[in-house]
Amino acid sequence: MADELVLEATGLRKAFGDVVAVDGVDLAVPRRGSLAIVGESGSGKTTVAKMIVGLEAPTAGTIVACGRDRSAPARGAKERRRRGGEVQIVFQDPYSSLDPRHSAVQAVDEVLRLHRPDMDKGARAARVAELGELVGLDERQLRARPRALSGGQRQRIAIARALAADPQVVILDESVAALDVSIQAQILNLLADIRERTDISYILISHDLAVVRQITDEVIVMHRGKVVERGGTADVLDHPRQPYTQLLRASVPRPGWKPARGPRATTEEGSVA
Amino acid sequence: MSALLEVEHLAARLPVEGELRTVLHDVSLSIAAGEAVGLVGESGSGKSMTARAVARLLPSGAQADGAIRFDGKDVAALKGGGLRDYRGEVAMVFQDPRAHVNPVRTIGDFMVEALRALRGVDRGTARKRAVAALADVGIPEGERRLGQYPHELSGGLLQRVMIATMLLTEPRLVLADEPTTALDVTTQAEVMAILDELRRERGMALLFITHDLELAGAVCDRTSVMYAGSIVETRESAKLHDDPLHPYTASLATARPTIDASVRRLAAIPGRPVSAFEAPEGCAFAPRCAYAQDRCRATRPPIEALDGGLVRCARAEELRGRLTEKVVNHG
């Protein structure tokens, strides 16, 4: 795609002591694009996400978001805030990612106060209502504490909160994995609607290939810190070329599927986790 | 085949903030020796509570009605030695193995405890059998594993240790409560293959609890779908996905994205799943059902036989064959 890139990472590497969690990862996200990072526990996919948002500093490599370098940690609050306005993240667990004392209104308003100093109280209230409507929360739900809300409703707050900073890129770190099937479909539809109505780009971190198929255009498959396969989502899932991608694909339950003991049953997992 | 486990009109209430809340309502199911039965549902549907009631592990203060019979014996009446024997015959595997193992005791201590307590086996023999059981679930070097602590093992490996441990008492029925939900997909496939193989080789019956309709369909002979504390459909697993009897089953199948194609919009079910105590009068699913009529909201339908399955829907017969059709138009 020749579109403008909103995010580009080159040669990304992260070592924790002797352990190399991420090893030479390149990725690029075009404006309005949607990229999946697929992998299992320990593949390094979440570490990549953390480096992009700035929760971990890369050992090597560069990250450029919206044309600005963010490879080194932000210096000062102003720089951090600016970066927050470019890339936001929605975590997996809506039970632990929200402040239990803040209603949705307070949680979203807090972000607006930080990122939109141009807005007065009235403008912020209007924006909170607008975001509430975008994510499908009614007036009562917006005023309730997270405790009184279901997992799906809480995840809607987390999404509204991320969008309040007007980011160019939202990282969805397993953001629908913990939701019930019927709620997961609602949130996936919501994410598709938001993408249609705004200029936003997504990076979806997921192990769920069906979810990846539904909301991303491109995919990279990670295994032990490295990218083993990349391409268009439909193409990679329909015609996986690498053995690891083929194994992932074959492990997904579907009608007529028979679980099989893989070749690594007695070998690879023998190592200490 | 006579049933190994029979559950009839099971109802359960749990004390929450000083009042008793209904969590199960009229649950009936049976499992024959060697049979695998799936129990599928979303949060609060009562699937775990059903397994806990069968295992006699309901939280304290819970009230249960109805009958649970294992091999003809009334499970509610078991106590002392009888209950201990029962716990050897009916084993449970949980979702999070790390929450069900003592972190400061070795794998060996954990594995032989049940064997020594329930079966009176001496330590040396118990350890030998533990090593053999580890080999059965694909873990080599069992002797070394017995000396390790839970934190030294990955989630998938620890779950296989749990399965090996449960095998030691040679149970006739295994209650597996989301045993692979916390595992990676490739590990899930392995753990499921192991459970499936053991079941076939040893004739163990399996009650497999999951939120994943496809997974239940792949490993179970029959599957029951639960909603708001009741079973709404029981059917041959192979038919559940393509030829469901209940609107809820049909919408569960189509709400999930598939790996083979993306759709413009998923056929999401409006609202959220409710627990038994929140369920309205009449059919519990009616507020979210595309086919609900006034009569659905007026009285709760009984569960009835239809086309070789059981279904709890007042309109099941007239909707026969139309459930998947409508949903396809949706998508």
Give the label of every model feature segment.
Chain B
Residues Q148-L153, L157:
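Conserved ABC ATPase signature
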Residues L168-R172:
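A short, proline-enriched helix->beta-strand linker immediately N-terminal to the Walker B motif
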Residues R56, L175, P179, L183-R264:
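P-loop NTP-binding/switch modules centered on Walker-like glycine-rich loops
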Residues L20, P140-L146, T234-G331:
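Short catalytic/signature loops enriched in Gly
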Residues Q63-D74:
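Conserved ABC transporter NBD signature motif
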Residues P59, V75-A91, D109, A117, ...:
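ABC ATPase NBD coupling module
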